[in-house]
From Swiss-Prot:
One of its GO terms (biological process) is 2-deoxyribose 1-phosphate catabolic process. NCBIfam families: deoC. GO terms for molecular function: deoxyribose-phosphate aldolase activity. The keyword Cytoplasm applies. It comes from Shewanella baltica (strain OS185). Belongs to the DeoC/FbaB aldolase family. DeoC type 2 subfamily. This is Deoxyribose-phosphate aldolase. Its EC number is 4.1.2.4.
């Protein structure tokens, strides 16, 4: 197997296959569940809006893919600074049966100089999650400033995040290697088991390999696993399957 094929295989096993569109329906989520059970193995998770969790759980059970985790989103996509609402949404997501919750950090508040709200929001949402995995989306493409990306990562980890995630996929700039470098460095400096999730903008096996390479350089060759690294993506899967000669070439897309 070539290095590119190895990267494609790994990226599938590390993927949160995502649909977070305004026109999502039960049928689209059912189709997503079937896609997540690929000829190259299952993705790590699917990521969907909370209201679709019950139908996703039913579908994954029916197709024998119970090991695929169900992730959902809260305080999404704008990263508002109302802690009470973020906590209510997170509790509801857990009640729906989410295995993982991706919550948006109040990044605009941080840009305005308020560090407290972000820390307190993440802390409260982690308490609401209990054993459910909490991934914190810092929206690195909007923060832009390396110092802000670093600070959002630090605050999220200090407040109890299980993962830090680059992006919602709803802004012009999503995952970049530069943001990955900063976020992974913070994880390394804090000597923590917190994971990393680049989301949006990873289009093919070659780009996936670049992100994996940064993670391995900073945190070691044995660090990357579904417990510590995820790709948030939708269109990436078809490209990876094509690299593995298991699907036709994907059509050009502007999607996540």
């Amino acid at each position: 197997m070539t290095d590119l094929k190895k990267a494609a295989q790994r990226a599938i096993e590390l993927m949160d296959l995502t649909t977070l569109n305004d026109d999502d329906t039960d049928q689209k989520v059912i189709d997503l569940c079937h896609k997540a059970k690929t000829a190259a193995g299952n993705t790590a998770a699917i990521c969907i809006y909370p209201r679709f969790i019950p139908i996703a759980r039913k579908t994954l059970d029916e197709i024998g893919a119970e090991d695929i985790q169900i992730a959902t989103v809260t305080n999404f996509p704008h990263g508002n600074d109302d802690i009470a609402i973020a906590v209510l949404e997170t509790r509801a997501a857990v009640a729906y049966g989410a295995d993982e919750v991706d919550v948006v950090f109040p990044y605009r508040a941080l840009m305005e100089g308020n560090e407290t709200i972000g820390f307190e929001l993440v802390k409260a949402c982690k308490e609401a999650c209990g054993e459910v995995l909490l991934k914190v989306i810092i929206e690195s493409g909007v923060l832009a400033d390396p110092a802000l990306i670093r600070r959002a990562s630090e605050l999220s980890i200090d407040a109890g995040a299980d993962f830090i995630k680059t992006s919602t996929g709803k802004v012009p700039v999503n995952a970049t290697l530069e943001a990955a470098e900063i976020m992974l460095t913070v994880i390394s400096e804090k000597n923590t088991q917190v994971g990393f999730k680049p989301a949006g903008g990873v289009r093919d096996a070659a780009q996936a390999a670049e992100f994996l390479g940064v993670a391995e350089r900073i945190l070691g060759a044995d660090w990357v696993s579904p417990r510590t690294f995820r790709f948030g993506a939708s269109s990436l899967l078809n490209s990876l399957l094509h690299t593995l000669e298991l699907a036709d070439a994907p059509k050009p897309t502007q999607g996540y």
